Amino acid sequence: MRSIAGLHKLKMEIFNVEELINMKPFKNMNKITINQNDNCILANRCFVKIDTPRYIPSTSISSSNIIRIRNHDFTLSELLYSPFHFQQPQFQYLLPGFVLTCIDKVSKQQKECKYCISNRGDDDSLSINLFIPTINKSIYIIIGLRMKNFWKPKFEIE
């Protein structure tokens, strides 16, 4: 069984959904939905799939670059580890360490991961799409992360 720690041996040799599952991309792997036809793992407002992207948007930037949203600059790590995301009630979420480990393994092979923000029409939500190349030039790990109420301040005073 492969784990994130074992990715150094894989060199991103990922070809199917079972290999994605073995990488344990989500906090609770017992609460996922697997779509074998689309090589996709679905969870709360996010997915991880292995596929050839239809297209990578021209607005995508390198995972090492900052992105400007609402006149503020963010790194990908800041978005992934955002307390606005983790303080929301949800039983499942994508592990930021999974994403950053994949990016690190790919960058060691002089390949570039890209990400973009997609506008879904909801001003308070944030949608991130990540494209992580594998050893096969046309196959990517594609991650979609949808954060509802990301921009809506919610505070709980105890």
Curated annotation (Swiss-Prot):
Protein's organism: Vaccinia virus (strain Copenhagen)
A Pfam family that the UniProt record links to this protein: Pox_F15
Keywords in alphabetical order: Early protein
Domain of life assignment: Viruses
Lineage: Viruses, Varidnaviria, Bamfordvirae, Nucleocytoviricota, Pokkesviricetes
InterPro entries: Poxvirus_F15
Protein name: Protein OPG060
Induction text: Expressed in the early phase of the viral replicative cycle.
Assigned protein family: Belongs to the orthopoxvirus OPG058 family.
